[in-house]
Amino acid sequence: MPPQLSDGLNYSAKIVRGSLDSLPQAVRSFVESSAKLCRPDQVHICDGSEEENRQLLSHMEEEGVIKRLKKYDNCWLALTDPRDVARIESKTVIITREQRDTVPIPKNGLSQLGRWMSEEDFEKAFNIRFPGCMKGRTMYVIPFSMGPLGSPLSKIGIELTDSPYVVTSMRIMTRMGTSVLEALGDGEFVKCLHSVGCPLPLKKPLVNNWACNPELTLIAHLPDRREIISFGSGYGGNSLLGKKCFALRMASRLAKEEGWLAEHMLILGITNPKGQKKYFAAAFPSACGKTNLAMMNPTLPGWKVECVGDDIAWMKFDQQGNLRAINPENGFFGVAPGTSVRTNPNAIKTIQKNTIFTNVAETSDGGVYWEGIDQPLAARVKLISWKGKEWDPKDGEPCAHPNSRFCTPASQCPIIDPDWESPEGVPIEGIIFGGRRPVGVPLVYEALSWQHGVFVGAAMRSEATAAAEYKGKVIMHDPFAMGPFFGYNFGQYLAHWLSMAQRPAAKLPKIFHVNWFRKDKAGRFLWPGFGENSRVLEWMFNRVVGEGGASVTPIGYIPDEDALDLRGLGDVDVKELFHISKEFWEEEVEEIQKYLEEQVNVDLPPEIKNQVLALKQRISQM
C-alpha cells in the first residue's frame, strides 16, 4: 500500500511520488496543512526529472489538456477556456494590515497602483474557496528557485498546485526539483498555494478540457507572511506563481526590506567592435518589445547583443559599488503574436523544441501560427484557431489570442549570455525606460541625474497592452512598467530608488528613456526599430564609457547630430524623431504632475515633487 498523508480522522491522500520524510520540516508542515485543507486524493512531490516531465506531458495529452505538435521536437499546445486568457488586475490583491503599506491613498477614487484587501475580507474569501478545492485531484509539490541555485541573490519557493500544466511550465520557467530542496535545507522559502478551483466530480463540463473557475478567481499576496495564494485561474501569470507574483510583487517588498531592487526589466549585454562589453537593464510595459530588444540581432557591423533575461531583473549593489543583476527566471514566457523571423529571429530559433504554446493557432500539419508570424501557409494547410475551430480570415477575429504565449527554456536561446547564470550577477551600467508613445517623445534621451532618472521612471506612459484585460488605444500611466506589479506603496518604492544615491561607493548606472514608436502625421513609424535599435544602444553604450556626444535639452540629454550612426538607414526624419515640442511637454508635465499628486498624494517623495517643478521650469524657458 502506498504511503499516505492523513489527518487521523476521515481524510487521507496517497503519496504517489517522493516521500514526505525527504522534505524539510517547514515544507512538510506546509504540504500537510494545505492537503488537509484542500483534500487532494494524491500528493506528488516533484523531482524535476526528465522522466517525470514526460509522464506529466503524456498524462495531459491523454486527458486532452494539451496536444503534441508533431512538426517540432517535444512541443505542445494548450488551448484554455476563453474566460482564462490573461492576468486579471481587478482580481489580484495584496493583503496588509494597513492599506497604506500596499498602496498610496489617492486624493479621490481608486488607486491605480495596486489593489489592497483587508485581512478580514481575505480570510472570508479564502474560506469560501479553498476547503476541499482539490478533491479528486493530485496536489503537486513544486520546489523552485528564483535565480541560479546557490546565488546569493536567489530565493526559494514551494508551490502547491493541482495543475500538471503548472508543473511542466514551472519546470521551464524556474529551476525546479530535488536539487532545490537540497539547497533549501531548513532555510526560508515563500509559500505558494494554487488551485484551479475545480474539485471532482465537476459540477459543470470544462471548456477545452481546461480547468478554471473564473467567477471565483483571486490572486492574493501576503507579504508579511511570505505567502502567495491563487485560486480559479490556470493562465500563466496567475498560476506560475514564481513569475509576476513572486519575482515582482513579493520580491519588490523583500527588496525594500533587504536593500535591493526587483524590477520588470530585461537584462542584455552589448559588446562593441573593440570587444568592450556593458550590461543594461530595461523596463518597458508589455507589448513594447522587451523580448525583441533582449534578443536583438544588431544591424550595426561588429556589435553584438546577448540576452541575460527578457522580463525580470533582481539587482543589488555589491561591496565594490557595482549594481549586480540576475535574471531570476529560467525560461521565457513570451507573447507569440508579432514574433517572426523579421522581428525576433532568436526567439523563433529558441521555440523550436521543448516549448509549451498556449492559445496560439495550430496548422493542420502540426505546427503553430499567429498574427504577425510572417510565414505563408503551405498549400492545402488549414488553420485551427485558438478557439479550436477551423479558421478563415473572413471570420474577422484573430487566429491566435492577442495574449497567446510560448513557454520555452532560456538555455535554448542562441544568443543567451555566457554569464546568464553567474551567481554574482552581471554589472549593470545603464538603465533604460521606455514606452509606446506615438507623439511627442523623442527616440532617446538621457536623464540629467539619478534623481531625474527616477522621476523619468515614475512618469512612464504607454499605449495599453494585450497582457492585461484593457481594450482600445489609450495612453496609460505605467510607472517603471511596474503598474500591475508593485508589492508595496509606490511612494515608498520611489523613496527606495532615490535612496540608492545615498549608498556609500555606489556606482549609479546612467538612466535613459527610449521610444521606438513615434509616428509621423500620416501615422507611419518614424523609426524602423528591431535590429536598427542597436544604433540607439550604441549611443547609450558610448555615453556609459564617456564618449557619445550629447546636447542638453529641458527633458534630458539627446544625441548630437553626428553621435547616432545612421549609415545605411535610408530616409529617416531625424529632426522629427528628436523634435521636442514646448506645447506637448507643457501638457505632458501637467498630466504627470496631476497623476503623481492624485495617485501618490502624501506619499510622493519631496525630491520627485522638485523634479516635476524643475522640469516645468525648464520647459517654460524653451
UniProtKB/Swiss-Prot annotation:
In this chain, GTP is annotated as bound at 287-292, 405, 436, 530-533
Under which pathway is this protein filed? Carbohydrate biosynthesis; gluconeogenesis
Q: Which example biological process does GO assign this protein?
A: response to starvation
- What SUPFAM superfamilies has UniProt attached to this entry? PEP carboxykinase N-terminal domain, PEP carboxykinase-like
Which Gene Ontology cellular-component terms appear in the entry? cytosol; endoplasmic reticulum; mitochondrion
Could you say which protein family the record assigns here? Belongs to the phosphoenolpyruvate carboxykinase [GTP] family.
Spell out the protein name for this chain: Phosphoenolpyruvate carboxykinase, cytosolic [GTP]
Q: Which organism is it from?
A: Bos taurus
| Lineage of the organism | Eukaryota, Metazoa, Chordata, Craniata, Vertebrata
